[in-house]
Amino acid sequence: LKKIKNTDDGIITLKNSNDFNILSPEFKFVTNKYLIEIVSRYLNCVPILTNLSLWYSPNDKIFENSSQEYHLDHEDYKQVKGFLFINDIDEQTGPLSIINTLQSNEIQKSINYKMTKKTKRVNDEIIGDLIRKNINIQENVITGKSGDLLLCDTSSCFHYGSRLGTKARYILAFQYITPFGFTVDWNWRNYDKLPFKHLECENNLLLKKVLGIKI
């Protein structure tokens, strides 16, 4: 596979949204009715699929001020990111580490967290200081087998991944946000940057909504 993009945070994109179409097995998986129903219940609306990518993390370098440090994602107030494990992932494979919503809210209040380019990342020293102040913080390291699926609200839960390890990580990553996400224009059906709105999906009303196609 040809490397498309290195984000300078340890994640290399091997495939992006433009490499998938309505017949792709990966596309069919992330738009299947069962999965969309789960995400819809959490977001309280039919979500929009805004990204589908195949990620490769070599886990061989440290990148400062990157997704290797704790952070929240900014695309929406609530969102769901999916991570389908392509290979087995253990603690030496740069696994995703997550802090739950309640504890993440406490961290935000304690450090007056602001989601700007300079302050979005939170290093381990800051988290360690909070723990020493008896603030309850528990890191959940997500490991699993090939084929396992993780769904996470990365706008609400502090997280990091792709830290140094002895093995590489391959993940199919995808993202759902609400029609009113911060990165989507108010008239979201006319938002040209939605990656899948050009696809043909006649007679499938739910799929049209998920892709942002005008109904």
Summary of predicted features, one role per range:
Residues 75-91, 143-145, 151, 175-179:
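Short, conserved beta-strand element in jelly-roll/cupin
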Residues 111-112, 149-151, 155-215:
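Non-heme Fe(II)/2-oxoglutarate
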Residues 45-48, 72-75, 86-95, 101-103:
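Active-site region of the double-stranded beta-helix
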Residues 67-74, 157, 161:
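Histidine-centered catalytic micro-motifs
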Residues 45, 59-62, 89-91, 104, ...:
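Short, charged/polar surface micro-motifs in flexible loops or helix N-caps
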Residues 92-157:
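Double-stranded beta-helix
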Residues 1-68:
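Non-heme Fe(II)-dependent double-stranded beta-helix
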